[in-house]
From Swiss-Prot:
One GO MF term: metal ion binding
Enzyme Commission number(s) from the entry: 2.4.1.355
Gene that produces this protein: tarS
Pathway(s) this gene product operates in, as recorded in its UniProt entry: Cell wall biogenesis; poly(ribitol phosphate) teichoic acid biosynthesis
The protein's assembly and partners: Homotrimer.
PANTHER family, A to Z: GLYCOSYLTRANSFERASE, UDP-GLCNAC:BETAGAL BETA-1,3-N-ACETYLGLUCOSAMINYLTRANSFERASE-LIKE PROTEIN 1
Catalytic EC class: transferase
Organism of provenance: Staphylococcus aureus (strain MW2)
Note: TarS is a unique target for compounds used in combination with beta-lactams to treat MRSA infections.
Catalytic activity: 4-O-[(D-ribitylphospho)(n)-di{(2R)-glycerylphospho}]-N-acetyl-beta-D-mannosaminyl-(1->4)-N-acetyl-alpha-D-glucosaminyl di-trans,octa-cis-undecaprenyl diphosphate + n UDP-N-acetyl-alpha-D-glucosamine = 4-O-([2-N-acetyl-beta-D-glucosaminyl-1-D-ribitylphospho](n)-di{[2R]-1-glycerylphospho})-N-acetyl-beta-D-mannosaminyl-(1->4)-N-acetyl-alpha-D-glucosaminyl di-trans,octa-cis-undecaprenyl diphosphate + n UDP + n H(+)
Function (record text): Attaches beta-O-GlcNAc (beta-O-N-acetyl-D-glucosamine) residues to the C4 position of poly(RboP)-wall teichoic acids (WTAs). Prefers UDP-GlcNAc as a donor substrate and is specific for poly(ribitol phosphate) WTAs. Can also use UDP-Glc and UDP-GalNAc, but not UDP-galactose or UDP-glucuronic acid. Mediates beta-lactam resistance in methicillin resistant Staphylococcus aureus (MRSA) strains.
The name this protein goes by in its record: Poly(ribitol-phosphate) beta-N-acetylglucosaminyltransferase TarS
UniProt-listed GO biological process terms: cell wall organization; response to antibiotic; teichoic acid biosynthetic process
Length: 573
């Protein structure tokens, strides 16, 4: 028996199927060990003619449906029934695979006896693909100890007997989301699920026009698939507690990432009864005992969806978005909420950490100015206080910076280096946090991972004069989590900057090892017997120009004792 059947449904794919076929023809795997099963859904272009050109390059099976089915489900089923490989790999006609995909997958499957193998995906041309489940290769994962429930597309490798023996096919009457039901059935029936993440094996490509798998689907059809998935989980040959946990995780995924997320705030009011009725049919298939296992913020939504109460459902989503509630209190760090008069209290709702976006970050040798916004926070403005926290990497020292400006939820903090420079030498690395306080509860969030474009090149720094020593302050982004931190270290001034006289009244300050930024404005140079005023301007990250108020002779330039900026003095002798 050959190792793989690569299943490709096609429909008007002439513009891009060549890339897929080339990737299959270039596989570092014996051509006798895999077949390519193409089932066409009545294309009206040159798709099949292009496929036929690969007869001598690939072990091809090509067929065409008699009538257009309107979706990839039926072509995949026809191909699956024709498949002779030990394993099947579903590939969309507008995607392609790594030349080592089949070779590496075969070796991995033989070693670990996988029934389902997830291969690492990579998006091309801005196509979004699941990533969280591909952080590492894993010979065996489950629906609960991994993130595989967050990828329910069929573009995986399946043991053929797993599918055929358990009658796992795509529901042909459904034209969208049918792949989620297919994949969930495979997960539930597999003895071993594995993840191969050594490299990008599957390239999902964003193309112009309509993807074969994408088409409008009504709320009734969409939520019917979700209901069928819930039923499939509940009917699985597993312990009830285990099934309930899987269903809860599926609901977490569904309400966080599907069209259900925020639908009452997006869909036209006149269409919302249709949506809530269909959603309600889905949720009514979920036993109420499962509600206790989902993310706590979803419990009110499940309650009102099950009751098909669109008004209160909308109130919940709007309340979460605004962070404003009819009644609420915080007990032991959790929210108790009543969304409307006469409605039940929902207790023990976790307050998720807010997401912080750094919208601005500017610094010089005088101050650091950063602007932050809070996003997706369950508590509205007016119920919390914010402050910036600088925490030393060794956790021994902490500095707090109060809020300077609150402009329409844009929080600005001014870190005056003069105020903190005495504390900075205590530690080389200072991490930046935003603290959000609600009563006695404090939420701490690292800053910088989400940000607007950073205004400086890497290693751009500021010079600080403290007592008789000079220091370099360098903001940087951490390697692992891409958050902003401050690096503070002693330097030798003459190794870091140089001064040159340009003409008779300009001094050029240049960074020798990196760019240095200075506060623009009034400056002065102090000579042995004189002081000359000037105006400092930053001409580039690596260069500063000081335009003097009068000419200076070269012999006097060599005797400059000090350089004064608006808030710093640099002793040069």
């Amino acid at each position: 028996m050959m190792k793989f059947s690569v299943i490709v449904p096609t429909y008007n794919s002439e513009k891009y199927i060549t890339e897929l076929l080339n990737s299959l023809a270039k596989q570092d795997f014996p051509k006798t060990e895999f077949e390519v099963v193409v089932v066409d859904d009545c294309s009206t272009d040159q798709t099949l003619q292009i496929v036929e050109k690969y007869r001598n390059k690939l072990n091809l099976k090509v067929s065409q449906l008699e009538t257009n089915s309107g979706g990839p489900g039926k072509p995949r089923n026809v191909a699956l029934k024709q498949a002779e490989g030990e394993f099947v790999l579903f590939v969309d006609s507008d995607d392609y695979i790594n030349k080592e995909t089949l070779k590496d997958a075969a070796a991995f499957i033989d070693e670990h006896h996988s029934d389902v193998l997830l291969i690492k995906m990579k998006g091309v041309n801005g196509r979004g693909v699941p990533q969280s489940m591909f952080k590492e290769t894993a010979p065996e994962v489950t629906l609960l100890n991994s993130r595989i429930i967050y990828t329910l597309s069929p573009t995986k490798i399946y043991r053929t007997t797993l599918l055929k023996d358990n009658d796992i096919y795509f529901p042909e009457e459904l034209k969208s989301a049918e792949d989620q039901l297919f994949t969930m059935k495979a997960y539930l029936n597999a003895n071993r699920i594995s993840v191969l993440s050594d490299k990008a094996y599957y390239y999902a490509t964003k193309r112009e026009g309509e993807h074969m798998s994408s088409a409008y689907v009504s709320p009734e059809d969409f939520y019917e698939v979700m209901r069928l998935i819930a039923v499939e989980i509940l009917n699985a040959d597993l312990e009830e507690a285990h099934k309930d946990q899987i269903l809860a995780e599926f609901l977490n995924r569904h309400f966080s990432f599907s069209r259900t997320n925020g639908f009452s705030l997006k869909v036209k009011l006149e269409d919302q009864p249709q949506w809530i009725n269909a959603l309600g049919d889905f949720i009514q298939a979920v036993p109420e005992r499962v509600d206790a296992l989902v993310m706590s913020k979803l419990r009110p939504l499940l309650h009102y969806a099950r009751a098909k109460d669109i008004d209160n459902y909308r109130t919940v989503e709007e309340s979460y978005r605004q962070g404003q509630y009819y009644r609420f209190d915080i007990v032991d760090g959790k929210l108790n909420i009543q969304f409307n008069e006469g409605e039940p209290y929902f207790e023990g709702i976790d307050i998720a950490k807010p997401k912080v976006k750094m919208t601005a970050f500017k610094f010089d040798n005088h101050k650091i100015v950063t602007e932050l916004t809070l996003n997706e926070f369950m508590i509205g403005e007016g119920h919390y206080d914010v402050r910036l926290k600088l925490h030393s990497r060794n956790k021994k020292h902490t500095m707090y910076v109060p809020l300077s400006v609150n402009a329409n939820k844009q929080y600005r903090f001014n870190i005056m280096l003069e105020d903190i420079k005495a504390y900075l030498p205590k530690e080389k690395i200072w991490d930046v946090f935003l603290e959000v306080q609600i009563g006695t509860e404090v939420f701490e969030v690292r800053v910088g991972n989400q940000r607007n474009k950073y205004a400086y090149t890497a290693e751009t720094s500021a010079l600080i004069h403290l007592n008789n020593d000079f220091y370099r302050l360098t903001p940087y982004f951490t390697k692992d989590f891409n958050n902003i931190s401050l690096y503070f270290t002693a330097i030798t001034l003459t190794d870091s900057i140089s001064l040159k006289l340009k003409g008779k009244n300009k001094i050029i300050l240049t960074g020798l090892d990196r760019g240095y930024v200075f506060e623009e404005g009034m400056a002065s140079v102090v000579l042995k017997d004189d002081m000359i005023m000037g105006m400092l301007s930053q001409t580039s990250e690596n260069e500063v120009e000081i335009l003097l108020s009068k000419d200076i002779k070269k012999r006097d330039f060599k005797n400059i004792v000090k350089l004064n900026t608006a808030h710093m003095t640099y002793s040069l002798k």
